[in-house]
Curated annotation (Swiss-Prot):
This is Crotonobetaine/carnitine--CoA ligase. It comes from the Bacteria. GO terms for molecular function: carnitine-CoA ligase activity; crotonobetaine-CoA ligase activity; medium-chain fatty acid-CoA ligase activity. PROSITE patterns: AMP_BINDING. Belongs to the ATP-dependent AMP-binding enzyme family. Keywords: Ligase. It comes from Escherichia coli O127:H6 (strain E2348/69 / EPEC). The keyword Ligase applies. Catalyzes the transfer of CoA to carnitine, generating the initial carnitinyl-CoA needed for the CaiB reaction cycle. Also has activity toward crotonobetaine and gamma-butyrobetaine. The gene is caiC. GO terms for biological process: carnitine metabolic process; fatty acid metabolic process. Its EC number is 6.2.1.48. It is an enzyme of class 6 (ligase). It catalyses: 4-(trimethylamino)butanoate + ATP + CoA = 4-(trimethylamino)butanoyl-CoA + AMP + diphosphate; crotonobetaine + ATP + CoA = crotonobetainyl-CoA + AMP + diphosphate; (R)-carnitine + ATP + CoA = (R)-carnitinyl-CoA + AMP + diphosphate.
Length: 517
């Protein structure tokens, strides 16, 4: 069944401009408060100009172009401008430094880069090392360095016509993007995403939150991340809704932005919820139009209830990863929700819990969460130039091994336990880091928490907590370990505590555990 009707991204944008015309498509708010607005017609014209810009710089179908940008209109222009001419976007995490960025450039074969002045010194050094295929850099800023191979993105774009000049034949099976995984446990892998993947993501994510053309979807998730692209942007654009892209998250500003733009849908991760909850109470906390808050793992029930009660919202849980494109397990718009369940398998997907021998497990037993989809359509196509890694997680019949552990109940609701690599082996017992983190997060003095296993000569692994305290609080080891003993089984009680000012996180708010072991 062809859910997207054979329509690639170029056709999508031409149709959106015709159907929705002067309706607001995109609102971007920068960290300095500058706001840019584009109608569907204007946005399509900017996308066309950007496509023409790339064509004048020698970019053709199949070429890879890297983007190292914070949330901004130029990211959207480039994403779909490249897709219109059959070129391939390679978004780079804006937090990455030189060595990691070089590695992605090398392993994606990107020949052109679009970035901003703040990141340019790093790429100037990368070019001098001559270790990549990069031959040109476009800067989104007005002022330019007097360097060879550097040009102004804005000036070049504004010189282009608003109609597309180069339109090679496209297929929905063509690659639109190579999105590198966050690499929290190993080197990032390039996830190949097709035009079909992105079109399907729009329809699927819109179904998941019952999105309409009168909705306003606001996000602070980074544009280089799968959540922003496939859960938010593609859903909003596919339904003719308004997409609000905020440059960076600010706990002090976020709720005001939700209210100012009259958002009906937004998305939150645990870090956002915890930092919002320590903001001063306001009589206007529940003065909003939010219908759903898309939520991604992981939160204790106490934290969830407190957040929902204070702000008058409900969470729509969604579980997925870069390779699944969307939240393939989640709550459904009209169905019951069963916290702490992560929901049920969505349409076009199957889900199973499997044991270490790849055999399906019955309800109630913990094993690996496995998902069945269609590669290149409802799940990723492959890892770029890495067939060995692809074969390790993706079976020939479309079953994807997530590397996450969980279980399901008799009614088909799934429950997340932990990443397999985060399960601690302690004296013959398996201990979930997430379970312990959810318990410790209820301590009134603790704002943020991560638990890791460290080598122990007697019990395989000992358990250590890294915590961030609420402002002005102090916490003794005696108080902390007493709390643990009162709230968890004896074999789960932690051995070590380290108090920190912050915790290392990637772009999607996930703790980078390998930096703590």
């Amino acid at each position: 069944m062809d859910i997207i009707g054979g329509q690639h991204l170029r056709q999508m944008w031409d149709d959106l401009a015709d159907v929705y015309g002067h309706k607001t498509a995109l609102i971007c708010e920068s960290s300095s408060g500058v706001v840019n607005r584009y109608s569907y017609l204007e946005l399509n014209q900017e996308i066309n100009r950007t496509a023409n810009l790339f064509y004048t710089l020698g970019i053709r179908k199949g070429d890879k172009v890297a983007l190292h940008l914070d949330n901004c209109p130029e990211f959207i222009f480039c994403w779909f401008g490249l897709a219109k001419i059959g070129a391939i976007m390679v978004p780079i995490n804006a937090r990455l430094l030189r060595e990691e960025s070089t590695w992605i450039l090398q392993n994606s074969q990107a020949c052109l880069l679009v970035t901003s002045a703040q990141f340019y010194p790093m790429y100037q050094q990368i070019q001098q090392e001559d270790a990549t295929q990069l031959r040109h850099i476009c800067l989104t800023d007005v002022s330019l360095p007097a360097d060879d191979g550097v040009s102004s993105f804005t000036q070049l774009k504004n010189q282009q016509p608003a109609t597309l000049c180069y339109a090679p034949p496209l297929s929905t099976d063509d690659t639109a993007e190579i999105l590198f995984t966050s690499g929290t446990t190993s080197r990032p892998k390039g996830v190949v995403i097709t035009h079909y993947n992105l079109r399907f993501a729009g329809y699927y994510s819109a179904w998941q939150c019952a999105l309409r053309d009168d909705d306003v979807y606001l996000t602070v998730m980074p544009a280089f991340h799968i959540d922003c692209q496939c859960t938010a942007a593609m859903a909003a654009f596919s339904t003719g809704a308004t997409f609000v892209l905020v440059e960076k998250y600010s706990a002090r500003a976020f709720w005001g932005q939700v209210q100012k733009y009259r958002a009906t849908i937004t998305e939150c991760i645990p870090m956002m919820i915890r930092t919002l909850m320590v903001q001063p109470l306001s009589a206007n906390d529940q003065q909003h139009r939010l219908r759903e808050v898309m939520f991604y793992l992981n939160l204790s029930e106490q934290e969830k209830d407190a957040f929902c009660e204070r702000f008058g919202v409900r969470l729509l849980t969604s579980y997925g990863m870069t390779e699944t494109i969307v939240g393939i397990i989640g709550d459904r718009p009209g169905d019951k929700r069963r916290w702490p369940s992560i929901g049920q398998a969505g349409f076009c997907y199957e889900a199973e819990i499997r044991d270490d021998h790849n055999r399906p497990l019955p309800a109630g037993e913990i094993g690996e969460i496995c998902i069945k989809g269609v590669p290149g359509k409802t799940i990723f196509k492959e890892y770029f130039l890495n067939p060995k890694a692809t074969a390790k997680v993706l079976e020939a019949d479309g079953w994807l091994h997530t590397g996450d552990t969980g279980y399901r109940d008799e009614e088909g609701f799934f429950y997340f336990v932990d990443r397999r690599c985060n399960m601690i082996k302690r004296g013959g017992e398996n201990v979930s880091c997430v379970e312990l983190e959810n318990i410790i997060a209820t301590h009134p003095k603790i704002q943020d928490i991560v638990v890791v296993g460290i080598k122990d000569s007697i019990r395989d692994e000992a358990i250590k907590a890294f915590v961030v305290l609420n402002e002005g609080e102090t916490l003794s080891e005696e108080e902390f370990f007493c709390f643990c003993e009162q709230n968890m089984a004896k074999f789960k009680v932690l051995s070590y505590l380290e108090i920190r000012k912050d915790l290392p996180r990637n772009c999607s708010g996930k703790i980078i555990r390998k930096n703590l072991k």
